[in-house]
């Protein structure tokens, strides 16, 4: 999975599906993983709030080219909603802005769920990374600015009430599309139920195609490096000790299960490597303007657009 390069770090490629702990920022997690693997390049496929835990897909090397396709995948969340308070951030971190003595019954909650299933309009939280006139909403909110975030369409595939905690929080599980804010959902349900609500606990359990079975903890990653061979407090391993750590990576092309795959011959592969379009005459080839993957000798070669049997490469992979 790795090769020599003049650039700083190793040209290592693959996915780390990190079980992000609470209090760790997503950018911090990426930096830690990048240092641990001594990777040239790293990025994540979907931010998790610091107060949230769970599945954070982190791409290394050539896998960063597949990040947009993972971000388009469905996400699954397990979360607790506390009723009776509205908070500035719509989660535990914020200050209380409104209170109510009312607590919803299970029947009232069940009756509300269909409203929040399917394609809905949702307004992101004031404390979010949405850009308003070039500024992040959370920066404006911290400065006390008054502003509005326009609602946008999101898709919620399923929303279930699955229990109640000892503290009286309602436990939900939701599968949704890109751009859905769980904090906004808690806020909006609280308004509809006449009692206010905020997120008391949030865990992401899936980002298609990755699931809980793919998760690995930070401690497990560090344990893959013999302690006596670490070079500093960041647990950066010596070159000869990367093999165990590299074996924990998920292959780059796993992220592309959502795309159709087609095999090229040698001449076609050479043209694609040079960034040229090619004609593909497979009778099963889609004719519409969609993305597909092409491979050569069972190796991922490129992602591109197919239209009227013409394949135009958009992202070309070096040898993985």
From Swiss-Prot:
SUPFAM superfamilies: Pseudouridine synthase. The gene is truB. The keyword Isomerase applies. This is tRNA pseudouridine synthase B. Responsible for synthesis of pseudouridine from uracil-55 in the psi GC loop of transfer RNAs. Pfam families: TruB_C_2, TruB_N. Its EC number is 5.4.99.25. Gene3D superfamilies: Pseudouridine synthase. Belongs to the pseudouridine synthase TruB family. Type 1 subfamily. NCBIfam families: TruB. It comes from the Bacteria. The active site is at residue 49. It catalyses: uridine(55) in tRNA = pseudouridine(55) in tRNA. It is an enzyme of class 5 (isomerase). GO terms for molecular function: RNA binding; tRNA pseudouridine(55) synthase activity. Keywords: Isomerase, tRNA processing. GO terms for biological process: mRNA pseudouridine synthesis; tRNA pseudouridine synthesis. InterPro entries: PsdUridine_synth_cat_dom_sf, PsdUridine_synth_N, tRNA_psdUridine_synth_TruB, TruB_C.
């Amino acid at each position: 999975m790795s090769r020599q390069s003049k650039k700083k770090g190793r040209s290592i490629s693959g996915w780390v599906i990190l079980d992000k702990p609470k209090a760790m920022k997503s950018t911090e997690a990426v930096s830690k993983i990048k240092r641990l693997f001594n990777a040239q390049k790293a990025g994540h496929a979907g931010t998790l709030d610091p107060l949230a835990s769970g599945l954070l897909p982190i791409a290394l090397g050539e896998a960063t080219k597949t990040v947009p396709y993972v971000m388009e995948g469905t996400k699954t969340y397990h979360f607790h909603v506390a009723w009776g308070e509205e908070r500035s951030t719509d989660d535990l971190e914020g200050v209380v802005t409104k209170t109510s003595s009312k607590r919803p019954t299970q029947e009232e909650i069940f009756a509300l769920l269909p409203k929040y299933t399917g394609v809905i309009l949702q307004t992101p939280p004031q404390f979010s990374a949405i850009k308003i006139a070039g500024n992040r909403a959370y920066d404006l909110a911290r400065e006390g600015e008054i502003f509005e975030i326009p609602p946008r369409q999101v898709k919620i595939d399923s929303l279930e009430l699955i229990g109640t905690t000892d503290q009286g929080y309602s436990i939900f599980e939701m599968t949704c599309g890109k751009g859905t804010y769980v904090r906004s959902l808690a806020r909006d349900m609280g308004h509809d139920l006449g009692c206010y609500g905020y997120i008391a606990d949030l865990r992401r359990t899936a980002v298609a195609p990755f699931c809980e079975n793919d998760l690995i903890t930070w401690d497990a990653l560090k344990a893959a490096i013999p302690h006596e061979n670490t070079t500093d407090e960041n647990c950066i391993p010596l070159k000869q000790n990367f093999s165990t750590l590299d074996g924990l990576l998920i292959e780059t092309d796993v992220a592309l299960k959502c795309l159709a795959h087609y095999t090229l011959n040698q001449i076609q592969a050479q043209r694609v490597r040079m960034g040229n379009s090619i004609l593909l005459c497979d009778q099963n080839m889609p004719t519409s303007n969609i993305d597909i993957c092409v491979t050569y000798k069972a190796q991922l070669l490129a992602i591109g657009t197919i239209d009227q049997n013409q394949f135009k490469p958009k992202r070309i992979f070096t040898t993985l």
